Structure formats: structure tokens, C-alpha cells
Amino acid sequence: VSAEMGEYERSSTTVADAYVHPIFKRYVQRLVAALEDMGITRDLLLVLSDGRTVTHDTAVQFPIRLVQSGPAAGAQAAVLYGGLSGVGDLLCFDMGGTTAKACLIEEGEPQRSASFEVARVFRFAEGSGLPLQIPAIDMIEIGAGGGSIARIGKLGLIQVGPDSASSDPGPVCYGTVSYTH
């Protein structure tokens, strides 16, 4: 799974990959079957955490390499649209439900890393998460996303997160509930 030095990091990467492998494999098999039922028989391409695309057969071999695929795909889209606009230096921003991620793109290339952490116990404390040795687009993460709940804290200041509206009732933009207190 990882050919890099670092026994603990290699082990944690391998264990994480083994954990998600059967779930991911079943999901991809169901997805490919559903696409075939709709008459779509081309190879399904998936995005790796480093922004490259691979066939579903390749992705299933080491699914941990897709753990940050959504934000990586966003960064690659920013590179594409920046290039079409003649802009090579960009700041790509990806807002999810609980976190927002930013990526610096210089001269049409996102910054990359050979490893990163997931599931940090302390959101910004390096070393408090599970290290993964997989190539990835380097992202800066903040703990506030589109579903984060904002409130007035004890000092009268606005506090955002860590609570999230999740999908039910969902963010205010869903229009299902009002979050005014």
C-alpha cells in the first residue's frame, strides 16, 4: 500500500486500507452494475487523493488512496478552469458540510504531499490523527463548513462549529428549519 519509509505510518496506511477495502469494493461493484443496467459500459473513472484519475479496477486495489478524492477533484477542476482563463496562480476553496479546505495552486500546479492525517482528535493538532502515507494534494483544513452551526458563545462572540446540522434537518439553505435563537 505504501512504499515509503516509516514503519508506523506504513502500518496505519495498510490497516486503514484493509478496513475500507471490502466496503469500497462492494460499493464500486454495485455502482458499476447499476451503470451497466442503464446501458453505460465505459470504464468508471475515479479520482485519487493526488488528483489523478484511475479506472475503478485500479481504485479498488488500494481504496485508501481515494480518501481525499473530493477536494482533490475540486483542486484539479480549479487548475483546469484557471488554465482555460489564463490564470495559473489560484486559491482553491472546497466547502463541505463540517469542514472547508483550501489548496494553493502555483503556476497551474497544486501543492502535493506524500502523507497527511485523517480523523484528528484535535482538529488542528498535528500528530493527533491517523497518518496515511499516500500521495495527496496538500490541503489546509478549517473546522467550519456549510452545515456548521453558529451560535453566540459565553463571551458574546460568534462561535462556529464543531456541531453540524448534518443532513437532517440540514443547513439553513435547505429551508427546512430556522436556526435563529
Language-model-detected regions and their locations in the chain:
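Short flexible coil/turn linkers enriched for glycine and charged/polar residues
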Residues: 40, 58-61, 96-99, 133, ...
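Conserved small/polar residues in nucleotide/adenosyl-binding loops
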Residues: 179-181
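Nucleotide/phosphate-binding catalytic cleft detector across ATP-hydrolyzing
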Residues: 1-88, 107
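Phosphate/diphosphate-binding loops
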Residues: 102, 115-158
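Short glycine-aspartate micro-motif
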Residues: 66, 88-94, 139-141
